Amino acid sequence: MASQAPRDFEAQALGLVPIVVETSGRGERSYDIYSRLLKERIVFMVGEVNDQTANLVVAQLLFLESENPDKDISLYINSPGGSVSAGMAIYDTMQFVKPDVSTLCMGLAASMGAFLLASGAKGKRYALPNARVMIHQPLGGARGQASDIEIQAREILYLKDRLNHLLAHHTGQDVERIARDTDRDNFMSSEDAKAYGLIDHVSTKRP
């Protein structure tokens, strides 16, 4: 009989999603691990924030709201950030749905990832002890004619101001400090992020 260990290692190396098998009186039912955790109202946002990941997160938030509008949803974040527009789609949906959306950073929440981490329900924003959080201003990469660059520059300045005001709202910091602190990449430990108001708790163990 072949050893199971090499097969498990091969599955991990290929990036395959583990399958969970549950047995009940009705027989066996298999789920991929993320679908099983979705039943526990846990949503993952891992990797770059883009239109695809935003669509997946938004769809799961809306589905869980339809399942039970009064039970909290947990959003687990490990993301270097990405598209502002995609991130704002997630942000607006988090504020739109009726259940509180709790956020938890595992690994890294940077840029839009940090913004979404801070946007969780007040008192329900967490980070694991060795997680890192990074805030900065929106990045621009304008190209084209001078008039096009001017239009894009105005849009970036608008987004910067809008994000600063929202981050000030969620952290309790004043907008001027947010503007200063996001002028360059600003990395924080979990404890620093808590002191800044980006999260409420550093979690070493599940409550």
From Swiss-Prot:
Q: Which domain of life is it from?
A: Bacteria
Q: What is this protein called?
A: ATP-dependent Clp protease proteolytic subunit
GO molecular function per UniProt: ATP-dependent peptidase activity; ATPase binding; serine-type endopeptidase activity
Q: Which HAMAP family match?
A: ClpP
Cellular localisation: Cytoplasm
Q: What is the stated purpose of this protein? A: Cleaves peptides in various proteins in a process that requires ATP hydrolysis. Has a chymotrypsin-like activity. Plays a major role in the degradation of misfolded proteins.
Q: Where the protein is mainly located, per its record?
A: cytoplasm
**Keywords tagged on the record:** Cytoplasm, Hydrolase, Protease, Serine protease
Gene that this sequence comes from: clpP
Say which species the protein is native to.
Burkholderia thailandensis (strain ATCC 700388 / DSM 13276 / CCUG 48851 / CIP 106301 / E264)
The active-site annotation reads S111, H136
- Family as reported in the entry's similarity comment: Belongs to the peptidase S14 family.
Q: Which GO terms describe its biological process?
A: protein quality control for misfolded or incompletely synthesized proteins
Cellular component, GO annotation: cytoplasm; endopeptidase Clp complex
**Subunit and partners:** Fourteen ClpP subunits assemble into 2 heptameric rings which stack back to back to give a disk-like structure with a central cavity, resembling the structure of eukaryotic proteasomes.
Recorded catalytic activity of this chain's protein: Hydrolysis of proteins to small peptides in the presence of ATP and magnesium. alpha-casein is the usual test substrate. In the absence of ATP, only oligopeptides shorter than five residues are hydrolyzed (such as succinyl-Leu-Tyr-|-NHMec, and Leu-Tyr-Leu-|-Tyr-Trp, in which cleavage of the -Tyr-|-Leu- and -Tyr-|-Trp bonds also occurs)
| SUPFAM superfamilies attached to this UniProt entry | ClpP/crotonase
Question: Do you know which InterPro entries this protein is assigned to?
Answer: ClpP, ClpP/crotonase-like_dom_sf, ClpP/TepA, ClpP_His_AS, ClpP_Ser_AS
Q: What is its EC number?
A: 3.4.21.92
